[in-house]
């Protein structure tokens, strides 16, 4: 039997899905779990008490467990340069297992990466393909493990159910690099590979923007039948992948009917055109797309104040991009948080055009954002240590401006920073914002 080590359970159920996949096959795998965090961090562990799994929590040095394993399933958040990983016999991940499975040999794989817009683009394409009567499954960085999809495909095979027409995989730079390592410096066969945008990100994990982007471009090689990239990336892409220029298309083109819309609609339209769908069918499919949680998600409108949850805006440029989409409405932004070693350059539009600014606390807020705001004489309230305090401040300010202008106001959570000092992750941050909105609505209806 193969000895499998799940290295890192993570915050978004990826590790749980990996554990479930291997632990449910006791005739094939012997399973261990190693995580630096204590057991109390993982509420779901009791679900595995009747399975033959060894857990090593608060495991500060996983060296012996790594040496024990035939294969290490590495959580993407664990650095690939972790010294102990040099002792591994083989390192893999969920995407490598899925894309090399016999069950996907007749399924078209679509991959989506990019600093900004990858989740919403993957979601829009998946939505459209379903509307076009295609059997499609989405997974990856969007919060659905490829092991969950692989389990479904195995169940389909047992029941004689056809495999999906398409699998859409959203891939972070870490997932791309992990898959590249798992497949021995290769990538799986891809029908359409998409690169949505380039900005600095994860500089708390990468030495430079260039190192970060080099992981991104590992996704693109002769394994890709079709390639779609944002036109701003064209020069960079040609420098790093000159052999792929002939199979590469850019978006948006001047003829793109979604050129004035959000990036996901621009990209999804061009992607579906490359996949040979008709214009009228594409328009009908995208017309019904309503977006995904935490990404410019309209939560509610109460007394002419709109509430938007954009918690997934974890870099400054993403916050400014979202604010451009709601301007010229008067908006009251909740921003700030933890530092990914990014500059404040990208936050300029969001801060300059905001009617009011409310700050969430964090080392990015304290060390970079507040000095930037004060340098440019932008007023702000906070920083606050809880979402409720920040929300109450922004909401009060929005009501005051509305009373004076009698115009619709927008309260938007678009932090432009990560969340880990005050929240579990960006989804927890967004959920707490939505809970604040729902509390107002409940009070109004009493």
Regions found by a protein language model. Give the residues of each.
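Short, basic phosphate-binding NTP loop
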Residues: 1-25, 29-111, 287, 295-297, ...
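Nucleotide phosphate-binding/pyrophosphate-handling subdomain across enzymes
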Residues: 3, 21, 257-354
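Residue-level signal for inorganic ion chemistry
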Residues: 22, 72, 112, 141, ...
């Amino acid at each position: 039997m193969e000895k499998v080590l799940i290295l890192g359970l993570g915050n978004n159920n990826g590790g749980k899905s990996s554990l479930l996949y291997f632990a449910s096959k006791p005739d094939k795998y012997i399973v261990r779990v190693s995580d630096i965090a204590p057991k109390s961090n993982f509420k779901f562990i009791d679900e595995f008490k009747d399975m033959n799994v060894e857990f090593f929590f608060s495991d500060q040095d996983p060296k012996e467990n790594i040496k024990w394993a035939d294969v290490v399933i590495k959580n993407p958040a664990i650095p690939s340069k972790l010294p102990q990983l040099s002792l591994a016999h083989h390192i893999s991940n969920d995407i490598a297992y899925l894309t090399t499975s016999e069950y996907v040999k007749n399924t078209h794989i679509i991959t989506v990466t990019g600093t900004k817009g990858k989740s919403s683009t993957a979601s829009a394409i998946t939505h459209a393909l379903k509307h076009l009567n295609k059997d499609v499954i989405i997974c990856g960085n969007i919060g659905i493990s490829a092991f969950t999809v692989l389990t479904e495909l195995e169940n389909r095979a047992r029941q004689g159910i056809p495999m999906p027409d398409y699998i859409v995989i959203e891939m972070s730079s870490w997932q791309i690099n992990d898959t590249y390592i798992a497949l021995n410096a290769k990538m799986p066969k891809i029908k359409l590979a998409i690169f949505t945008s380039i900005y600095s990100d994860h500089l708390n994990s990468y030495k430079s923007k260039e190192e970060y982007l080099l992981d991104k471009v590992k996704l693109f090689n002769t394994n890709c039948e079709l390639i779609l990239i944002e036109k701003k990336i064209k020069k960079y892409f040609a420098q790093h992948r000159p052999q792929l220029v002939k199979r590469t298309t850019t978006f948006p083109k001047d003829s793109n009917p979604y050129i004035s819309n959000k990036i996901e609609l621009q990209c999804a339209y061009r992607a579906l055109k490359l996949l040979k769908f008709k214009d009228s069918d594409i328009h009908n499919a995208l017309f019904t797309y309503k977006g995904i949680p935490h990404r410019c998600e309209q939560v509610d409108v109460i007394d002419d104040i709109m509430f938007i949850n954009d918690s997934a805006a974890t870099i400054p440029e993403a916050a400014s991009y979202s604010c451009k989409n709601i301007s010229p409405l008067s908006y009251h932004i909740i921003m700030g948080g933890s530092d990914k070693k990014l500059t404040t350059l990208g936050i300029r539009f969001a801060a300059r055009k905001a009617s009011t600014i409310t700050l969430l606390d964090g080392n990015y807020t304290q060390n970079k954002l507040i000095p930037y705001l004060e340098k440019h004489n932008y007023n702000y309230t906070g920083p606050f240590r809880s979402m409720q305090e920040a929300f109450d401040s922004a909401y009060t300010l929005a009501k005051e401006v509305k009373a004076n202008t009698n115009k619709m106001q927008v309260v938007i959570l678009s932090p432009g920073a990560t969340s880990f000092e005050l929240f579990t992750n960006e989804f927890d941050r967004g959920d707490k914002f939505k809970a604040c909105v729902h509390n107002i609505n409940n009070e109004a209806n009493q």
